[in-house]
């Protein structure tokens, strides 16, 4: 039961990621919800297995999730300062 709920939340976040293309902040929030679902599934998987290297996997995923959030917010601030908006339509990476 918990695994189906975790996979459902992951795929709903993936669906939201593919459908929500207006603001950069909403895109970052859906990425964070995907990372949270991945962290919870890895933590449950580590509880079932007793191997020592597997126990460190949730902490590694949590570390990468925090780095991803920090990089995403810094990119959002940089683009908001240069383009004066956080909408994804206004961003043209070929001009930068």
UniProtKB/Swiss-Prot annotation:
Enzyme Commission (EC) number: 7.1.1.2
Locations listed in the record: Mitochondrion membrane
Membrane-spanning residues: 1-21, 27-47, 57-77
Pfam families from the UniProt entry: Oxidored_q2 (PF00420)
Reactions catalysed: a ubiquinone + NADH + 5 H(+)(in) = a ubiquinol + NAD(+) + 4 H(+)(out)
InterPro entries found in the cross-reference section: NADH_UbQ_OxRdtase_chain4L/K, NUOK/Mnh_C1-like
Highest taxon listed in the record's lineage: Eukaryota
Enzyme kind, highest EC tier: translocase
GO annotation terms (biological process): ATP synthesis coupled electron transport
GO molecular function, one term: NADH dehydrogenase (ubiquinone) activity
One GO CC term on file: respiratory chain complex I
Membrane topology of this protein: Multi-pass membrane protein
Keywords: Electron transport, Membrane, Mitochondrion, NAD, Respiratory chain, Translocase, Transmembrane, Transmembrane helix, Transport, Ubiquinone
Biological role stated in the UniProt entry: Core subunit of the mitochondrial membrane respiratory chain NADH dehydrogenase (Complex I) which catalyzes electron transfer from NADH through the respiratory chain, using ubiquinone as an electron acceptor. Part of the enzyme membrane arm which is embedded in the lipid bilayer and involved in proton translocation.
Sequence similarity: Belongs to the complex I subunit 4L family.
Stated name of the protein: NADH-ubiquinone oxidoreductase chain 4L
Organism: Petromyzon marinus (Sea lamprey)
The encoding gene: MT-ND4L
